Amino acid sequence: MEQFHGTTILSVRRGDKVALGGDGQVTLGNIVMKGGARKVRRIYNNQVLVGFAGGTADAFSLLDRFEAKLEKHQGNLTRAAVELAKDWRTDRLLRRLEAMLIAADATTTLVITGNGDVLDPEGGICAIGSGGSYAQAAARALAENTDLSPREIVEKALGIAGDMCIYTNHNRIIETIE
């Protein structure tokens, strides 16, 4: 049975500001099932931004576990991410989940994968999902050549990804921490 897939999630950090955004498209095979899904959330007392790509049910399961890890480790983003990645890699049921997460707080941005990777992106820019490469390339160009805010960069870069990737639409949700 096919899973719901297809999205673009992008995070841009500049100075003490971070923006995390995503599109709203959910795709089952080659059919758009929903255009307004919310794949970017605020968790842990609105102090942490999380965006997810991949299988929708898998992502929600991981998001719940990640929020529990944040509670357990008093909001320590890195520790919670490492603990989630360890569980994800070693637990037989979790290992089958197909999703990726980007998490950001006031000081740190991390990409968390099912391979047990917890990555701190270079240059404060990272993206996941089907349109991630397009969005990341656009964001890097905008960050290097303009004085736009992280929110403005995310908005423009997701627009470019939406123009190029058939699994990404222009219905964007963007959250910021300043």
Curated annotation (Swiss-Prot):
This is ATP-dependent protease subunit HslV. A double ring-shaped homohexamer of HslV is capped on each side by a ring-shaped HslU homohexamer. The assembly of the HslU/HslV complex is dependent on binding of ATP. Belongs to the peptidase T1B family. HslV subfamily. Its main location: cytoplasm. Allosterically activated by HslU binding. Its EC number is 3.4.25.2. GO terms for cellular component: HslUV protease complex; proteasome core complex. It catalyses: ATP-dependent cleavage of peptide bonds with broad specificity. It is found in: Cytoplasm. GO terms for biological process: proteolysis involved in protein catabolic process. It comes from the Bacteria. Na(+) binds at residues 162, 165, 168. Keywords: Allosteric enzyme, Cytoplasm, Hydrolase, Metal-binding, Protease, Sodium, Threonine protease. One of its GO terms (molecular function) is metal ion binding. InterPro entries: ATP-dep_Prtase_HsIV_su, Ntn_hydrolases_N, Proteasome_sua/b, Proteasome_suB-type. The active site is at residue 7. Protease subunit of a proteasome-like degradation complex believed to be a general protein degrading machinery. It comes from Burkholderia mallei (strain ATCC 23344).
